[in-house]
Every structure is written in C-alpha cells, then in structure tokens.
Regions:
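Glycine-rich phosphate- or other oxyanion-binding loops that anchor nucleotides, phosphorylated ligands
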Residues: 1-199
C-alpha cells in the first residue's frame, strides 16, 4: 500500500482454541519467515453495546485475552483516539450478565483472534496495531453457535450449510441477510481504515 510493501494473511475466525492457535501459528510463521516492521490486525467484531452502530470503527486502547486475562497494548493508529477494551474470546458470549460485566470493565467489542496475534508480536518484539469494525451486536441475539457455524474457518459463507439452516429455519432469512449486510459493511469499513492507516 503506497510506498510500504504489504503482506496480507487470513487467519480466519475462531470459536475454539484450535482457531486461536491457527491465528497464532499463522502470525508466528509470517514473523519467522519475513522481516516485518509492523503488524496491523484488521477485521470485524461484535459490539458489546446494543446502541453501537454497525460499521463503527473499533480502535481499542487495550486488548485482553478472555482465556487468561493477559493484556496487550496496541500501537496507536492515526485514525482517531483509541478507547475501550477489545476482549478476545474463544467462546460465543450470549449471556446478558456477562455482557454487563464486560461493559463495566470498559469492553467495547468482542473478537476471536486479536489477543493471540498480539501475543506472538510481543514475544518477537514486533509493534502491532488493531482496527476492527462492528459487524453485529453481541447482545442482540443475532449470532449464536449455529449461525457462527454457517461460516467456513476462513470466514467465508458456507453456502450448503446456510441452505440447510434455512430449510430448518425458513423464517431466519431476514436475520441472515442482516448479518451478511453488517459483515459486508464492517469489512469494507475496516479495509478502508487499514488503507488509510498505512498511506
């Protein structure tokens, strides 16, 4: 991008340690193979607050691993003021009490990969930043384990699984359309911000 040589890798999405390990392994392989000056984690996330608009850019001051509460501080980006905490978890968090507790801790958004990537970067002394855009809201019930299972590990839609899901739940097509639109908007917003960040 611009005058900066750029390498992009896809770590996919995750709901279990195996997927977090994949993000970790992909990052480690990249950093062990190529001299990298800076890693930017770009992707989508779920807002913890029902009032957060879809497409909102998330620039956290802190990333916390839900697995062991380890904390990572990203390098600030020139995209606006960083605020709040991004909580990385292998679990799909749907309990409103958990959401309230996380909000009280300053969590603004949830993802499934950033802490794993940050850990590798910090172990190797490579600066890193993160930007995410909100694709859905954790507290509105739009995503559950079955819905998350409609995506391939790389994040792309699994069309046969979606068709089977709609045969079982014919009234759910509006939910899927809303999620697809939210994911598309968030992905575009995150990509635009990433280009701006390195330009």
């Amino acid at each position: 991008m611009g005058e900066h040589p750029t390498i992009a890798i896809v770590t996919g999405i995750g709901t279990a340690q195996a997927h977090a390990a994949t993000a970790q392994a992909a990052t480690a392989q990249l950093l062990d193979t190529v001299k990298v000056e800076w890693v930017i984690v770009v992707g989508i996330s779920g807002a913890i607050d029902n009032q957060t608009p879809i497409g909102t850019l998330v620039l956290p001051e802190l990333v916390v691993s839900g697995a062991d509460c380890s904390q990572y501080r990203p390098k600030p980006l020139r995209l606006g003021d960083a605020h709040g905490t991004l909580w990385t978890t292998d679990s799909l968090l749907v309990d409103p009490r958990v959401h309230a507790d996380l909000r009280n801790r300053g969590v603004v958004s949830l993802d499934m990969e950033t802490a794993a990537i940050a850990k590798v970067c910090e172990q190797r002394g490579v600066p890193w930043s993160v930007l995410r855009a909100v694709s859905d809201r954790a507290s509105d019930g739009s995503v559950d384990a079955e819905i998350l299972g409609l995506a391939n590990p790389d994040g792309r839609a699994n069309s046969p699984a979606a068709a089977r899901y709609l045969l079982r739940h014919p009234g759910a097509w509006l939910r899927l359309v809303r999620l697809a639109r939210g994911s598309k908007l968030a992905s575009e917003r995150a990509a635009e911000a990433a280009i701006t960040a390195v330009s």
